């Protein structure tokens, strides 16, 4: 808490001006002017800073001295246009203010609750006997005293400064708080009994309201289902998205409903366990109130579950959930039996019977919902057999009516249809309609039941756990138990017995006027077995005086006492008592049989539902086993089929590899034969040239200058054709030899590899197939890369033509082909086609020149070779674009700069730039230079050889 800061100056508003001061302009003041009071005394309490805990709300005011107060009064009396002292304000912290608001709200709620209790107690009817009148008057007076004590009008006091202060005075010995639910630690006395009885009545009325709400909800549910069965629902065709949403919503509703049913089942189980622990004779007030509140909460949960079920039923139409409906019906039935067992209110058994009948009607209606033609007929039969709560009963559920009015309503609405009711329902209703006169007769004659009860039933009274559940099936008036307990502890007054005999006489007169119901008349004269078993009675006492041996010194008994004892215990009374006992035994056996029959009838749906659930579980387990077997069989068949397919593929692959190996060896042999055939004439030529060179080498030293000068013109004439004849022959011979040797070595390498693969494939065929597949994948990847690197101008007509060609010629790889986008890029440069040079053996010496000329002519003719089909298709599919020269120049400059940049930094192929291709071109150039050097040397050798041949021939001719 912060420090409380008192105000050092006081402010007030001048609301109006005085009429007499209007003439003086100096005294004129504007309206609503702020005026500051500087005459506040310098009291240390006004200026000190104090710290305090928020124990209570304190209204602190500024204090004035006595003289200043009197002086202010004189000023107020003399001058009316000025205020001598302003209104004093106090400083209150926010925490204190919020706490005060909280307390005020609590007081308002308490006052509203007590007013509601007063109105409820005033609306309750007065009972017929005087005891109830006195009790109600005592309750009203007590409630009025409590309200008067707790809500006295606050006394308003005016301070000297004019501030209004509300002072609340509390009376000692009075408390606004209600009596707690915990048991007292000492004897509270008789003054707290009316408040406890009032709380009991409130809890009982609360439980009755919840039961009646459940009854009303059940009747509404039956009406809605009946309306749905009467009208035909047409299913509309929905979109797939809408159907999916509906399916998801239904799944969520099913999960929510299952969760609610599980929670309700746990609540019912806990309530049943607690009620089994509680003894029917000695139920404490706190435990009973706790049980009533738990029952009310369970009833509210059942109402919510019933509303969810009705919503699902109206949404799904012809697809109800019968298992959940049966489970909910059994839970509501158990709740109703628990409320009847607790005996919270006398009218609870009537409502419980109605709820049980409504549950039976609902279950039978839902069972016959699948056959719409029989539904209407079935529901009319159900309504005739079990009258569901009618409109009058539903209209009166929020208000609590007296027992006499409730009895008249029940007799009006249910007894005309007794002809169609089952006999057990008749007996239960007859037991419910027992009047108060019978209870008063039991009050006035507490020993009648003790006399009617047989000695054999005494051990059953002590062991209540066995017959307590059966007693709930035939509920009786719970006030008989309480009144019996009260009369057993208090002496019976004569006045009360006389007053209780009067309604009993009226009851007998009313029963004489109804001769058509002899069974109910006999039933009304006796109590039920459950009520007698619930009564807390002492063991049977013999009212006769115990036998005392006569004392010779004692005086003899008086004749009056002897005659009284003889008259009281006459044989006629003994016979009458024996006949009454026999009649009680007969009725008890009959009632026990009826109770067992009713218990069997009520437990039949639970047994039937459990039986059906077991059957459903067995069917589900069988279905799961069947599905599992089918799945395993399918898996076995699939695995066997796939293994067969793999074996077939393996065999096919082995056959293909064998064929490939055979074809490879055959191809290698053919290539070797062809190479040998081509090499034989070349070797013969080489040998001839070599022999001629060796034969004419010794003639190089012999030629003379004369011979050389004479032979010079002839040499010039014959040198050119000889040179031109020998050099191309040697060059072609060397090239052919190199190519054939390379092809032969490659074939040998391939043959060795295939043989090694075939040898390995026998051991590991899977590895061989994997390697072949990887090679195919690499080839396909290379084709894809070439396709993407290939830059063409394409159009849809070309695509259609290519698709037709692809359909006509099946591809080797069945992989997916890329799409054909429109590309505007640069085409790759085409290499010049290789020129085939054919060497033929000359027929004579002069034919070499002709062959040379023919070869040159053939080269000229073969230079413009026709393009392939692919090039023709590309040219047909190309689209020419007109590009300005400046733009073309800028594009070329950019490409050159980019290639120069790539030459500096790049080591991989990017676009059209390929460093390895450049390296290969460099290597080709180097090889060409080397070949040129070799050719030059060979040409020199040939020149020397020609010179030697010329000299030899010239010398021979000269000689």
UniProtKB/Swiss-Prot annotation:
Its main location: cytoplasm. Residues 124-156, 456-560, 572-610, 692-721, 848-883 are annotated as: Disordered. GO terms for biological process: centriole replication; cilium assembly; cytosolic ciliogenesis. Residues 877-959 are annotated as: Necessary and sufficient for CEP20-binding. It comes from the Eukaryota. The keyword Cytoplasm applies. Residues 707-717 have a biased composition (Low complexity). Pfam families: MNR (PF15718). Residues 547-558 have a biased composition (Pro residues). Residues 515-533 have a biased composition (Polar residues). Residues 134-145, 456-470, 583-599, 857-874 have a biased composition (Basic and acidic residues). It is found in: Cytoplasm, Cytoskeleton, Microtubule organizing center, Centrosome, Centriolar satellite. Residues 582-674 form a coiled coil. Keywords: Coiled coil, Cytoplasm, Cytoskeleton, Phosphoprotein. One of its GO terms (cellular component) is cytoplasm. The modification Phosphoserine is found at residues 279, 691. Interacts with CEP63 and WDR62. Forms a complex with OFD1 and CEP20/FOR20. Interacts with PCM1. Involved in centriole duplication. Positively regulates CEP63 centrosomal localization. Required for WDR62 centrosomal localization and promotes the centrosomal localization of CDK2. May play a role in cilium assembly. This is Protein moonraker. It comes from Mus musculus (Mouse).
């Amino acid at each position: 808490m912060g420090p409380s800061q008192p105000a050092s100056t006081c402010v007030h508003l001048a609301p109006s001006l005085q009429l007499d001061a209007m003439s003086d302009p100096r005294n004129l003041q504007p309206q609503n002017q702020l005026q500051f009071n500087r005459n506040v005394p310098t009291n240390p309490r006004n200026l000190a800073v104090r710290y305090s805990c928020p124990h209570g709300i304190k209204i602190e005011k500024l204090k004035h001295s006595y003289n200043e107060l009197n002086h202010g009064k004189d000023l107020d009396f003399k001058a009316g246009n000025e205020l001598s002292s302003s209104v004093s304000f106090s400083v209150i912290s926010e925490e204190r203010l919020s706490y005060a608001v909280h307390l005020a709200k609590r007081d308002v709620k308490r006052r509203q609750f007590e007013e509601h209790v007063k109105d409820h107690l005033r609306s309750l009817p007065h009972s017929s006997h005087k005891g109830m009148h006195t009790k109600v008057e005592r309750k009203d007076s007590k409630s009025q005293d409590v309200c008067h004590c707790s809500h006295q009008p606050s006394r308003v006091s005016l301070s000297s400064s004019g501030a209004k202060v509300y002072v609340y005075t509390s009376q000692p010995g009075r408390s606004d708080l209600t009596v707690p639910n915990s048991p007292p630690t000492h004897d509270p006395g008789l003054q707290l009994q009316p408040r406890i009885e009032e709380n009991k009545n409130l809890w009982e009325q609360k439980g009755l309201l919840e039961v009646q709400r459940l009854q009303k909800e059940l009747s509404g549910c039956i009406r809605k289902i009946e309306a749905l069965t009467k009208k035909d629902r047409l299913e509309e065709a929905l979109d797939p998205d809408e159907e999916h949403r509906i399916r998801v919503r239904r799944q969520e509703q099913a999960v929510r409903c299952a969760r609610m049913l599980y929670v309700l089942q746990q609540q019912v189980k806990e309530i049943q366990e607690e009620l089994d622990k509680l003894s029917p004779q000695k139920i404490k007030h706190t435990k009973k109130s706790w049980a009533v509140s738990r029952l009310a909460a369970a009833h509210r949960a059942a109402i919510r579950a019933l509303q969810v079920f009705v919503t699902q039923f109206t949404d799904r139409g012809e697809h109800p959930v019968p298992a959940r409906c049966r489970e909910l019906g059994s839970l509501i039935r158990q709740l109703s039996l628990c409320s009847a067992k607790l005996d919270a209110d006398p009218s609870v058994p009537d409502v419980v019977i109605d709820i049980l009948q409504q549950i039976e009607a609902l279950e039978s209606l839902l069972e016959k919902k699948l056959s719409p033609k029989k539904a209407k007929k079935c529901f009319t039969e159900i309504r005739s057999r079990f009258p569901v709560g009618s409109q009058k009963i539903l209209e009166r559920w929020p208000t609590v009516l007296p027992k006499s009015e409730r009895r008249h309503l029940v007799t009006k609405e249910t007894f005309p249809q007794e002809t169609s009711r089952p006999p057990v329902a008749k007996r239960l209703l007859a037991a419910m309609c027992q009047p108060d006169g019978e209870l008063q007769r039991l009050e006035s004659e507490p020993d009648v039941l003790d006399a009617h009860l047989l000695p054999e039933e005494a051990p059953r009274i002590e062991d209540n756990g066995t017959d307590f559940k059966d007693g709930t099936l035939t509920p009786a008036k719970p006030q008989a138990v309480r009144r019996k307990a009260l009369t057993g502890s208090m002496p019976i007054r004569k006045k009360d017995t006389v007053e209780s005999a009067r309604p009993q006489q009226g009851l007998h007169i009313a029963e004489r006027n109804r001769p058509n119901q002899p069974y109910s008349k006999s039933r009304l004269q006796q109590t039920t077995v459950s009520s007698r078993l619930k009564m807390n009675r002492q063991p049977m006492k013999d009212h006769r005086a115990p036998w005392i041996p006569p004392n010779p010194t004692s005086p003899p008994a008086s004749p009056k006492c002897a005659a009284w004892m003889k008259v009281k215990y006459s044989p006629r009374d003994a016979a009458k008592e024996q006949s009454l006992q026999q009649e009680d035994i007969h009725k008890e056996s009959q009632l026990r049989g009826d109770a067992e029959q009713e218990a069997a009838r009520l437990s039949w749906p639970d047994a039937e539902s459990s039986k059906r659930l077991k059957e459903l579980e067995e069917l589900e387990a069988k279905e799961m086993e069947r599905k599992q077997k089918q799945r395993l069989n399918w898996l076995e068949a699939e695995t066997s089929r796939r293994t067969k397919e793999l074996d077939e593929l393996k065999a096919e692959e082995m056959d293909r590899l064998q064929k490939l190996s055979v074809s490879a060896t055959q191809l290698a042999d053919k290539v070797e034969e062809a190479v040998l055939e081509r090499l034989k004439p070349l070797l013969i030529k080489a040998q001839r040239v070599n022999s001629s060179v060796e034969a004419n080498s010794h003639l190089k030293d012999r030629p003379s200058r004369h011979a050389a000068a004479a032979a010079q013109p002839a040499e010039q004439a014959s040198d050119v054709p000889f040179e031109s004849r020998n050099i191309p022959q040697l060059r072609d011979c060397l090239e052919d030899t190199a190519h054939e040797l390379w092809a032969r070595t490659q074939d040998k390498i391939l043959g060795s590899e295939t043989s090694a693969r075939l040898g390995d494939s026998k051991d590991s065929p899977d590895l061989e197939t994997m390697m072949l597949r990887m090679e195919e994948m690499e080839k396909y990847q290379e084709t894809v890369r070439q396709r993407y690197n290939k830059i063409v101008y394409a159009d849809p007509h070309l695509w259609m033509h290519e698709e037709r060609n692809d359909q006509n010629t099946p591809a080797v790889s069945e992989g997916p082909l890329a799409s054909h986008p429109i590309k505007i890029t640069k085409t790759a440069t085409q290499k010049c086609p290789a020129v085939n040079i054919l060497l033929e053996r000359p027929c004579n010496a002069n034919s070499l020149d002709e062959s040379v000329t023919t070869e040159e002519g053939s080269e000229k003719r073969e230079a413009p070779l026709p393009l392939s089909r692919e090039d023709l298709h590309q040219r047909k599919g190309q689209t020419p674009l007109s590009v300005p020269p400046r733009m073309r120049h800028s594009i070329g400059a950019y490409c050159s700069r980019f290639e120069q940049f790539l030459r500096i930094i790049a080591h991989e192929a990017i676009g059209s730039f390929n460093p390895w291709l450049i390296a290969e071109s460099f290597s080709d150039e180097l090889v060409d230079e080397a070949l040129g050097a070799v050719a030059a040397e060979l040409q020199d050798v040939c020149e020397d050889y020609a010179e030697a041949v010329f000299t030899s021939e010239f010398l021979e001719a000269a000689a």
